[in-house]
Amino acid sequence: EEKDIHIDVNDLACRFIDRYCKNANLSIVENFLCECPVYKPVNDMILIPAKGSFDDEYEFVSAVLHECCHSTMKENRLGRSYPNLKTNNERYAFEELYAEIASSFLCADIGIEIKQEKIDNHTAYVQFWYKQIKKNPEIIFSALNGAEEISEYIEVKGELQELLIESKKEIYTEFDEETNTYDLCV
């Protein structure tokens, strides 16, 4: 007998982030003085403003995932070592490209609906950083490869597949935009 079950993808995203942080031994700290999320490599933590300061759940999840992507630069994770990252514009631009593209991959893999306005924001952000290093058109392929490596690492460390299975078997391709859930078959 089949019965329909709905997965709340926002809940799934939060559980995935929690599991990644736990397994990566990474802290997320809500800081009311913080204006935007930031990964602090020295402390190996992500600082985020109050969740209510984000426009919507997608903004919150994608911003936190963006910072989780930066956390993979740590030596005990993927080890992208950037001495003086903030003063090396090209390396900084690469890191931002990696994180923005990888966080978009992660949101898609989780199943979070991305509205056109958000896609436009991602596109503008990627284009801004791409312009910083556009001397070589091959760079975008390098950024895509780096982003794929990051998203795969985070998915494994955050046990995304296991969370999807825990949330109940196979996902149908039909997404209910009103409830922000997938229809499932158990």
Q: Where are the regions a protein language model picked out?
A:
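Glycine- and acidic
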Residues: P49-G52, S81-N88, W129-I133
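Long, well-structured alpha-helical subdomains associated
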Residues: R91, S104-D176
